[in-house]
Every structure is written in structure tokens, then in C-alpha cells.
């Protein structure tokens, strides 16, 4: 039953990561979202080096370039997410971001001519209803965010999780061509046993280089960096994110049919943690539509594994 432990651990770790991302994304700190990227890149880079030193995956550095399209889609999507977290409640942003799986399914139907099961169609429709409901309440209601940020910035902030979902979905879609079959993958020198490690290491090293570039950019702009202890929330978020990636692989390798919906419950974990630790409180109407989104995501996770 180790897969069950890893499944629950993944949901908790990623839920905790979302909590600390939100705590580290300070609205009054102009470059806080970029500083989070630097922290995540540093931790992922360290994990990539650890993988290369402890595992014989036959890594070819050219795979950094080969896997670059996927890596960039994932990295840029996360940067948009971190920006949105500065102004948007985690209770709203996380369920919307997790609709990326539904978008990826639609891309497969449209571009690869794949078919959806009736349950998948129902799940996607439920997600759409929930997202439209949240969007309607956010843009037509008299929210505190509009009063605090102004209408323009409030709308921009609300768009961030949607941009994340789109970019992450395209990243997952393109990832199919890299990871679906090791015999036809563009990745160089991989086997059935090493293909996922090679892809993940390429992603983590790219994130580390991206983080280094952002660090140099901010130094050139004379952005002030507080002592490391003051960045503890950003660092903890990066650690939980990377740890969740580790447990995720082992969870799906055991019993993917049950593991997938458990992992998808990260939305619920994030919602609970935000309510408990961040004291986020939304209207009952908004919570209702968020619940609809979460139900749709869980149904989609189940339908994809049946």
C-alpha cells in the first residue's frame, strides 16, 4: 500500500507548496513572483544535480535543448501563477489552475482526434460551469479586491490562473510527444527506465538556468534581496513543490487508477489550508462554484484512469 502513502503525501506536499507560495507572494513586493521563481529554480537545480550524482540515467546535455519547448511552457506558466498569487486568494486561483487537465484533454480531442468517455465529457462540462460561475461573481460582484487594487489590476490578477492553466495544458500536451513512447521520443539516449528521469532533470536544470537569469536581471535592476531567513516561505514552497514531484512518480507507479483522483484532491487541501492558515473567506456563492470545479476535476481524474 506504499502507493497510497505516496498519493496522500503528494496531495499534502503540493497543497502545502501552494500555501507557502501564497505566503511568499507579497502584494507590496514588486518582484516577489520573480524571487519565488529564483527559489524554485535553485531547489530544482539542486535536486537535478543530486539525481545526476546518485542515478545512472546516461544524461546527455543536449536534452536541455530538446526538451526546452516543454520546460519553457511549464516555467512561464508558473511565473504567471506566482504573479497572480500576489493579489488573488489561493482558494480561487488553485481550483482554476487545476483545470489545465481538462484543457489538455480537449487539446487531445481537437488536435489528435482522440475520443472522450461520457464521464470525461460530463466532468469537463461541470468544470466549465464552475469556472464560469466563479468568473461571473468575480467580474460582476462588488469584491473587496476591486476596491483594494482597482478594477484593471483586479481583472489582470484574475486572468493569471487562466493563463497558467492554458500554458500548463499546452505543456502537458506537448509532453505527450516526448514521454509517450521511449522508442519515438525526441529525447536523446533514453531507455524505458530513464526517460522520465531524463525529462524531469532537463526541466529542473532549465528552471535553474532560468532562475539564474532572473537573479542576474534583478541584480542589474538593483532589486534588494532580504537575508535568506526572510525568504523562508518562498524556499519552503520550492522544497514542498520538488518533494511532491518525487512522491508523484511513486504514487502513479503503484495504482494509478486510485492515485490520480487522490492527487487531484490537492485543490481541497489547498482550500482547507488557505482557510485555516491564511484566514481566506469568500462568499458562499463563490465557495459553491469552487466546489463544482473541484468535483469536476476529481471526476475527470477518475474518468481518465477507467
What are these regions (language model features)?
Residues 37-41, 97, 120, 124, ...:
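Residue-level recognition of transmembrane alpha-helices
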Amino acid at each position: 500500500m506504499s502507493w497510497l502513502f505516496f498519493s496522500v503525501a503528494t496531495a499534502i506536499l503540493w497543497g502545502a507548496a501552494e500555501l507557502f507560495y501564497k505566503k511568499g507572494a507579497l502584494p507590496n513586493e514588486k518582484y516577489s513572483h520573480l524571487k519565488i521563481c529564483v527559489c524554485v529554480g535553485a531547489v530544482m537545480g539542486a535536486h537535478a544535480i543530486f539525481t545526476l550524482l546518485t542515478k545512472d540515467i546516461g544524461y546527455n546535455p543536449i536534452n536541455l535543448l530538446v526538451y526546452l519547448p516543454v520546460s519553457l511552457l511549464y516555467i512561464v506558466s508558473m511565473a504567471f501563477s506566482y504573479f497572480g498569487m500576489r493579489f488573488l486568494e489561493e482558494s480561487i486561483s488553485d481550483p482554476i489552475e487545476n483545470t489545465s487537465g481538462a484543457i489538455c484533454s480537449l487539446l487531445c480531442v481537437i488536435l489528435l482526434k482522440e475520443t472522450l468517455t461520457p464521464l470525461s465529457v460530463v466532468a469537463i462540462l461541470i468544470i466549465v460551469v464552475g469556472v464560469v460561475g466563479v468568473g461571473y461573481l468575480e467580474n460582476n460582484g462588488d469584491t473587496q479586491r476591486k476596491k483594494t487594487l482597482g478594477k484593471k489590476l483586479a481583472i489582470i490578477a484574475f486572468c493569471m490562473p487562466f493563463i497558467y492553466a492554458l500554458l500548463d495544458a499546452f505543456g502537458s500536451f506537448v509532453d505527450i510527444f516526448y514521454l509517450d513512447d521511449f522508442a519515438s521520443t525526441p529525447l536523446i539516449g533514453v531507455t524505458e527506465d530513464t526517460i522520465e528521469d531524463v525529462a524531469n532533470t532537463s526541466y529542473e536544470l532549465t528552471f535553474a538556468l532560468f532562475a539564474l537569469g532572473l537573479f542576474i536581471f534583478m541584480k542589474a535592476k538593483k532589486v534588494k534581496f532580504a537575508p535568506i531567513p526572510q525568504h523562508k516561505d518562498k524556499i519552503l514552497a520550492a522544497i514542498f513543490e520538488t518533494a511532491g514531484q518525487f512522491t508523484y512518480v511513486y504514487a502513479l507507479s503503484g495504482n494509478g487508477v486510485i492515485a490520480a483522483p487522490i492527487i487531484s484532491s490537492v485543490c481541497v487541501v489547498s482550500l482547507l489550508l488557505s482557510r485555516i492558515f491564511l484566514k481566506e473567506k469568500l462568499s458562499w456563492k463563490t465557495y459553491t462554484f469552487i466546489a463544482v470545479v473541484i468535483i469536476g476535476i476529481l471526476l475527470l481524474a477518475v474518468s481518465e484512469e477507467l
